[in-house]
Amino acid sequence: MSQERLLKVLKAPHISEKATNNAEKSNTIVFKVALDANKVEITNAVEQLFEVKVDSVRTVVVKGKTKRRGAKIGRRSDWKKAYVTLQEGQSLDFVEGAAE
């Protein structure tokens, strides 16, 4: 897989209360990923970009919400979320550098 595709697969870490609890309890990191990305691409991207070993990947497509602004009705885009479980002894911390 090309370096360009690796960078396009992972869009951002998804930070939420549920994601934080998963990270602490089951060593699972949550990412926003490209809609067309598959589990193999997500695994390769995480392993190569962050130099950690991935145990499993679960994905879900989050449906966009319908929003109104006055009489106009629109819809937000669908997006894909990936739950990446790291192997025992592996860790990935996004908040550590921000504390300084």
UniProtKB/Swiss-Prot annotation:
Keywords: Ribonucleoprotein, Ribosomal protein, RNA-binding, rRNA-binding
InterPro entries: Nucleotide-bd_a/b_plait_sf, Ribosomal_uL23-like, Ribosomal_uL23/eL15/eS24_sf, Ribosomal_uL23_CS
GO terms under biological process: translation
Record bears the keyword Ribosomal protein: yes
Gene Ontology annotations for the cellular component aspect, listed alphabetically: ribonucleoprotein complex; ribosome
A Gene Ontology molecular function term of the record: rRNA binding
PANTHER family: 60S RIBOSOMAL PROTEIN L23A
Free-text function comment from the UniProt entry: One of the early assembly proteins it binds 23S rRNA. One of the proteins that surrounds the polypeptide exit tunnel on the outside of the ribosome. Forms the main docking site for trigger factor binding to the ribosome.
NCBIfam families per the UniProt record, alphabetical: PRK05738.1-1 (NF004358), PRK05738.1-3 (NF004359), PRK05738.2-4 (NF004363), PRK05738.3-2 (NF004366)
Family the entry assigns: Belongs to the universal ribosomal protein uL23 family.
HAMAP family: Ribosomal_uL23_B
Record text on subunit structure and interactions: Part of the 50S ribosomal subunit. Contacts protein L29, and trigger factor when it is bound to the ribosome.
Protein name per Swiss-Prot or TrEMBL: Large ribosomal subunit protein uL23
Primary gene name: rplW
